[in-house]
Amino acid sequence: MEEEQDLPEQPVKKAKMQESGEQTISQVSNPDVSDQKPETSSLASNLPMSEEIMTCTDYIPRSSNDYTSQMYSAKPYAHILSVPVSETAYPGQTQYQTLQQTQPYAVYPQATQTYGLPPFGALWPGMKPESGLIQTPSPSQHSVLTCTTGLTTSQPSPAHYSYPIQASSTNASLISTSSTIANIPAAAVASISNQDYPTYTILGQNQYQACYPSSSFGVTGQTNSDAESTTLAATTYQSEKPSVMAPAPAAQRLSSGDPSTSPSLSQTTPSKDTDDQSRKNMTSKNRGKRKADATSSQDSELERVFLWDLDETIIIFHSLLTGSYAQKYGKDPTVVIGSGLTMEEMIFEVADTHLFFNDLEECDQVHVEDVASDDNGQDLSNYSFSTDGFSGSGGSGSHGSSVGVQGGVDWMRKLAFRYRKVREIYDKHKSNVGGLLSPQRKEALQRLRAEIEVLTDSWLGTALKSLLLIQSRKNCVNVLITTTQLVPALAKVLLYGLGEIFPIENIYSATKIGKESCFERIVSRFGKKVTYVVIGDGRDEEIAAKQHNMPFWRITNHGDLVSLHQALELDFL
């Protein structure tokens, strides 16, 4: 009975064990049963042992739901087990258990073909690479490497594709292809529908044109050295409408995925825009120069243009008249000034007699072709310039005016006739100025030039070495900019024997507009891709050169001319 009173103090047990315990206790407490079955005595004698085993203080009952799926592996638990990992569908390649690489690899973006992949057709289904024929994955298999695309326009575009790419076991590289576009069956992309990935685009069977330029594609990817998964390569393509597609090789570059940075149609070069804009902004009085600019067939081949000042740079003339040269170099002032005056007389003789300086003095031009647009091309072989009634005292070269006789259309045509005749005379006698002079004046000119060459210590001869060296180069040209009026400057060039060095279209007068504006006109003619070198002695050309970021070579003495020639010989200039 004492044992029955102690039962409530025992700990709680499982249902089956409680029943077995109660039966054992009832058998022990029943004397009748113990008398009939001797085995019960042995059970009673062993009761303390069973109480010692069954007594457990830390045993907690559990329900069947408390056991994990590890104990019941035969039963699938969708909420516990992870999603089966997709495996590669390509034969002959290693099976990977995870979608993440165990070892990080750096990404090296490159625009060329990556790691030996053939440039055409290697990424398309059915093409045979080195590893064998690429099989199109079936719907029951999952491809490790897939390409996802996003449509950026509602219209059918040939630039949106999804296709399988051969996996790489080492590096994850950005893939760029310019191969011929082909239609990919929808089954090649439908295999990814069972995977837990974002939405994929299924291709239709639209027909596209055979080929498009590679500049319309952009590749997106990581650009840092962090670890990158090789299981998914996302490629985005940006394209224009096929009707306006045009190649743009000069603008090709890798896109970062932003459509605004993708290459588009090829655009005009800045230098051409600058040339066109500068020509449109020119005033009407400079219309004629376009014809002269178009006559030069070698302008596009030029690499360097040398802009020369005339007086005190190539020739010594003004300092002869003022006597400053005689004072600087210790020469006889009377002889020096006399030689200068004689040369000045011959210059104006040629200008007045043969180059219409009396008519053109008041309507001077910057360039000989500035009024060529007003020339109607009339034959001038029998034309009388002395009786055509032209007077240049009031015209001042103003264009576009039709009021009265001076400055009108007829007046402008007669002015253009004279400048056309000046050009013809210059071209005819640029290598033989003696044809414009009488025999006596021709001999006088020869003596005068020899005398000036002695007085100036062969200044002109030293400068000619550099001029001839530049002229011998096919990609270089000499251009003359002088502050003398155009017609006297042409006469001066002829009399000093420089006609073959400077064609008339390469001579500019800065009397009206200044040297800086002359430089602008020359730059608009030859373009900004050409290198310009300014050679002179004055502050005006130095300032103009600095304004246009042109190198300036100062000439102040004979040594500067010698150094210039040495620099040219060594190809420094």
Swiss-Prot record:
Give the GO molecular function terms: histone H2AXY142 phosphatase activity; metal ion binding; protein tyrosine phosphatase activity
Q: Which residues carry this modification: N-acetylmethionine?
A: M1
Instruction: Tell me where in or outside the cell this protein is found.
Output: Cytoplasm; Nucleus
Cofactors required: Mg(2+)
Q: Which key words are in the record?
A: Acetylation, Activator, Chromatin regulator, Cytoplasm, Developmental protein, DNA damage, DNA repair, Hydrolase, Magnesium, Metal-binding, Nucleus, Phosphoprotein, Protein phosphatase, Transcription, Transcription regulation
Name the reaction it catalyses: O-phospho-L-tyrosyl-[protein] + H2O = L-tyrosyl-[protein] + phosphate
Name the Pfam families for this protein: Hydrolase
Q: Name one GO cellular component term.
A: centrosome
Q: Which domain of life is it from?
A: Eukaryota
Q: What is its main location?
A: cytoplasm
Q: How is it modified after translation?
A: Ser-266 phosphorylation is required for localization at sites of DNA damage and directing interaction with H2AX.
Where do the annotations place Mg(2+) binding?
A: D309, D311, D537
Which of the seven top EC classes does this enzyme belong to? Answer: hydrolase
| Low complexity: compositionally biased ranges | 254-271
Q: What is its EC number?
A: 3.1.3.48
Q: Which GO terms describe its biological process?
A: anatomical structure morphogenesis; cell differentiation; double-strand break repair; negative regulation of extrinsic apoptotic signaling pathway in absence of ligand; positive regulation of DNA repair; response to ionizing radiation; visual perception
* Catalytic-site annotation from UniProt: D309 (nucleophile), D311 (proton donor)
Where in the sequence is Phosphoserine found? Answer: S262, S266, S438, S472
Q: Write down how the cofactor binds this protein.
A: Binds 1 Mg(2+) ion per subunit.
Comp. bias intervals (Polar residues): 20-46
Q: Which CDD domains match?
A: HAD_Eya
NCBIfam families with a match to the protein in the record: EYA-cons_domain
Subunit and partners: Interacts with SIX1 and DACH1, and probably SIX2, SIX4, SIX5.
| Membership in a protein family | Belongs to the HAD-like hydrolase superfamily. EYA family.
Q: What is this protein called?
A: Protein phosphatase EYA3
